């Protein structure tokens, strides 16, 4: 066929890879909700979901059926357009951010020269989902959760970018593949240990995960900005949170733990094992740490994490200048 040119074939292959990768990310996010409940049960000395299917294996299917058939109610007192837009942003922002992550030397969605900046942009966009949900719900608890989210995001996105500048300076590029290639002999977690620690803390905060789940604190805000949502709109928020965990875990692997590099096993297996480990760490943190007060969260970001990040950046610059 004359219209099937090599350029078109390459475009179709690229689109096919992108669809497969993003579908796998969404599936991992959905299955992580099931895995989290089982692991929390293990950590707390109980069984977790074990009634639907063999050993609870079909619990995710039951949850999906329940979500699909729940009434998707939109209260009359809400701003309906923004109320509907918020869960869409929550679901898509971190999913699109995963597009810059190279899974293997040949598998990835987008190879951008501004990869890290693109992630920071999408992480900043994710907070608009919370702000829109809190404002459009016309509920005081939702609004309080949204205000908390905006303040927390401003605090922690200041140093989530600075924590990555040491990695960028060492690799000499914002491109994710270049950063992975620069770790072929030494992972960045060793020279950039403090950068990794602050990025991991900020990553948990970006995902609004415990102990940084102040915007949706159940005991204080009755589930915060989620309070007026039901049905699939609530489901989009729910799955979007787990997609954020998958994305941040993959970025930790890519930026600090060598990406797909590793001995003996294929690159994809190494990437999956490393990412799965950090996804489990998110669950372990939820099971083991208490939720601090809101003022303690803010003070920790500005008084502890930001100075550490700046000192790490200065030390990295000094080492690079000395070696030059």
Curated annotation (Swiss-Prot):
Parts of the chain that traverse the membrane: 11-31, 81-101, 114-134, 154-174, 186-206, 237-257, 265-285, 304-324
GO molecular function: NADH dehydrogenase activity; oxidoreductase activity, acting on NAD(P)H, quinone or similar compound as acceptor; quinone binding
Enzyme nomenclature, EC number: 7.1.1.-
Membrane topology type: Multi-pass membrane protein
Record flagged with keyword Lyase: no
GO cellular component, one term: plasma membrane
PROSITE patterns per UniProt: COMPLEX1_ND1_1 (PS00667), COMPLEX1_ND1_2 (PS00668)
Main subcellular localisation: membrane
Enzyme type, top EC level: translocase
Catalyzed reaction equations: a quinone + NADH + 5 H(+)(in) = a quinol + NAD(+) + 4 H(+)(out)
Domain of life the protein comes from: Bacteria
Protein's UniProt keywords contain NAD: yes
Annotated compartments: Cell inner membrane
GO biological process entries: aerobic respiration
Pfam families (UniProt xref): NADHdh
Keywords associated with the record: Cell inner membrane, Cell membrane, Membrane, NAD, Quinone, Translocase, Transmembrane, Transmembrane helix, Ubiquinone
Family per similarity comment: Belongs to the complex I subunit 1 family.
Summary of subunit composition and partner proteins: NDH-1 is composed of 13 different subunits. Subunits NuoA, H, J, K, L, M, N constitute the membrane sector of the complex.
Main function: NDH-1 shuttles electrons from NADH, via FMN and iron-sulfur (Fe-S) centers, to quinones in the respiratory chain. The immediate electron acceptor for the enzyme in this species is believed to be ubiquinone. Couples the redox reaction to proton translocation (for every two electrons transferred, four hydrogen ions are translocated across the cytoplasmic membrane), and thus conserves the redox energy in a proton gradient. This subunit may bind ubiquinone.
NCBIfam families attached to this UniProt entry: PRK06076.1-1, PRK06076.1-2
Record protein name field: NADH-quinone oxidoreductase subunit H
Annotated source species: Pectobacterium atrosepticum (strain SCRI 1043 / ATCC BAA-672)
Gene expressing this chain: nuoH
